[in-house]
């Protein structure tokens, strides 16, 4: 009986070790993660360039209808950015970077929220509030970049030019 118990314990321990190493092999490396998310970010960057075409001119226009159109463009860009963020969240993350990436996703959510508020302010014709929201978008983008700088993103790196 004692020999059988030892064999069972040894077998269980070996299976746990194998399961642990198999799980570790499933975790992508940081470079593999970047390779998986960059195409998503690239598609979103290109979509936002199309959505936000001429938005700066419209937002600074004296015509209220042009300002409202700019607001609609920012709201649409916010929705596209949110969809891209959701896609990014589904990509398997390296276990070592999980906490950092969760903070990055939180920062990206704030960018999305601020883009939406910027669009709402422009649609309401409140240019001063819109200017404040634009600064908040830039600050949130910088915060997201500060969290994700170790990944050396290209398309996932946010800049003011992404949203103007």
Residue ranges of each PLM-predicted region?
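C-terminal region of N-terminal signal peptides and the immediate post-cleavage residues
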Residues: 8, 15-32
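Bacterial N-terminal signal peptides that target proteins for export
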Residues: 1-9
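Terminal, positively biased "leader/anchor" segments
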Residues: 2-3, 16-19, 131-132
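Alpha-helical segments in soluble extracytoplasmic regions
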Residues: 29-119, 129-163
């Amino acid at each position: 009986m004692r020999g059988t118990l030892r064999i069972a314990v040894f077998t269980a321990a070996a299976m746990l070790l194998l399961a642990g190493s198999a799980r570790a092999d499933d975790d992508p490396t940081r470079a593999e993660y970047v390779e998986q998310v960059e195409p998503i970010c690239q598609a979103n960057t290109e979509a936002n360039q199309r959505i936000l075409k001429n938005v700066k001119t419209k937002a600074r226009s004296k015509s209220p209808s042009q300002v409202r159109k700019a607001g609609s463009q920012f709201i649409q860009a916010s929705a596209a950015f949110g969809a891209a963020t959701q896609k990014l969240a589904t990509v398997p993350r390296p276990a070592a970077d999980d906490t950092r990436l969760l903070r990055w996703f939180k920062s990206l959510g704030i960018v999305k929220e601020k883009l939406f508020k910027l669009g709402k302010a422009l649609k309401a014709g409140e240019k001063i509030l819109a200017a404040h929201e634009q600064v908040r978008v830039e600050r949130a983008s910088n915060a997201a970049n500060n969290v994700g700088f170790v990944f050396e993103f290209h398309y996932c790196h946010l800049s003011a030019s992404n949203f103007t």
